[in-house]
Amino acid sequence: MTNNIRLLFGQKVRQIRLSKSNMSQEKLAFECDLHRTYISDIERGTRNVSLDNIEKISKALGVQPKDLLDFTTIGNCEQKK
């Protein structure tokens, strides 16, 4: 379960990042004052992200932190009825 939520979070970050004029991982990392490999780890679902870093990422992407946790709009990951 833990790995699943990390993967979903990473997919959401990537989806929003690419929808913002194809923002690169490097540019996002710069805007967040984080390392590019940290962003890469997040997007691959291998990094556990702190609330502080979720806030930094959401600000850099111009979204609310809750938007990064809304997994209903990722590919096949729709809420089950």
From Swiss-Prot:
Annotated GO CC locations: cytosol
Residue ranges flagged as DNA-binding region: 25-44
PROSITE patterns: HTH_CROC1
Top-level lineage group: Bacteria
Domain HTH cro/C1-type: 13-68
Keyword field contains DNA-binding: yes
GO molecular function: DNA binding; DNA-binding transcription factor activity
Gene3D superfamilies recorded: lambda repressor-like DNA-binding domains (1.10.260.40)
Pfam families: HTH_3
Record GO biological process: DNA restriction-modification system
Classification via SMART domains: HTH_XRE
Keywords: DNA-binding, Restriction system, Transcription, Transcription regulation
Purpose of the protein: May help modulate methylase (M) and restriction enzyme (R) expression as cells undergo physiological changes such as sporulation or transformation.
Name recorded for this polypeptide: Control protein C.BamHI
Organism of derivation: Bacillus amyloliquefaciens
Organism taxonomic ancestry: Bacteria, Bacillati, Bacillota, Bacilli, Bacillales
